[in-house]
């Protein structure tokens, strides 16, 4: 069975209706027998909104905390995508970066990443988000 990585940017997951549309595209690939890994961005405009909240909170913010706040948008979208796929009877779960794990350099806001291999459980054929 082939592996397919599908990436959805902020505009394509901008709201719940668009997440459902993206999930239908994932479902089509699953129906064709593919193992799918889904990567999602934050919903359109959410990263800027989160960054504005940081700026409203602190004039001289810590880059580590800025990254923690701003990256939460992707986590929300991943959870919503997993829930949408589950509603379609497709086994799915979201993963946070630390669960994969995704390792980074310590250069906050401009870190380089190193991604470990993700294990997809063959018996469940779970969609990984």
How should these model regions be labeled?
Residues 1-125:
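Nucleotide/pyrophosphate-binding catalytic subdomain
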